Amino acid sequence: MASDVSSHLLTVTQSRWTIHHMYNKLLILALFTPVILESIIYVSGPQGGNVTLVSNFTSNISARWFRWDGNDSHLICFYKRGEGLSTPYVGLSLSCAANQITIFNLTLNDSGRYGAEGFTRSGENETFLWYNLTVKPKPLETTTASNVTTIVTTTPTVIGTKSNVTGNASLAPQLRAVAGFLNQTPRENNTHLALVGVIVFIALIVVCIMGWWKLLCSKPKL
């Protein structure tokens, strides 16, 4: 009896573990399947040039290439194994195959989102790819040197040595007048400094004499 109960509990535990293990596998697949089956490829091409969108589809798989405008998809070409291709999308010049398409004579309006969808023989979706195409505008044409005309105008001026000397001589008194005391000669500066020193010395002597006289001659108050 006890052995039957223990075997029953073991069976229940194993079944629960199996269910839990399968649940974890399904959860992992649900999380990572969109990443595996869908990716974004960024491509760019020059304006007026060509660009090729390459897929990982094999030649024995049918492929549907389309352009996405944000709300709806427009079929570019449908490559069906053994039946060739069709290009119903107006405005694109391209060559189409299962593993790639090439868009010729790119314009700025060709920038946008493109998609590729591959099918197996049973019709099931094998993989899905997104392409983000950016068409780079042509650089602005620069003007060559031969097409540029340079106009040079000259103004005749006559400057003599004598006139330059006269002009400099006439400016000298004005500069000295503006500078004032600083532009005087060293001899004049020394004379002024000596006079200032004598005046200050005499003033100090007078102040000292007056101070002593007031101190000696004043009568003390009783």
UniProtKB/Swiss-Prot annotation:
In the UniProt record, which residues carry a glycan?
Answer: 50, 56, 60, 71, 105, 109, 125, 132, 147, 164, 168, 189
- Please indicate which superkingdom the organism of origin belongs to: Viruses
Q: How is it modified after translation?
A: Highly glycosylated.
Task: Report keywords, A-Z.
Answer: Glycoprotein, Host cell membrane, Host membrane, Host-virus interaction, Membrane, Modulation of host dendritic cell activity by virus, Secreted, Transmembrane, Transmembrane helix, Viral immunoevasion
What are the subcellular locations of this protein? Secreted; Host cell membrane
The similarity comment for this entry is: Belongs to the RL11 family.
How is the quaternary structure described?
A: Interacts with host FLT3.
Q: Can you say what this protein is called?
A: CEACAM1-like protein UL7
Q: Which organism is it from?
A: Human cytomegalovirus (strain AD169)
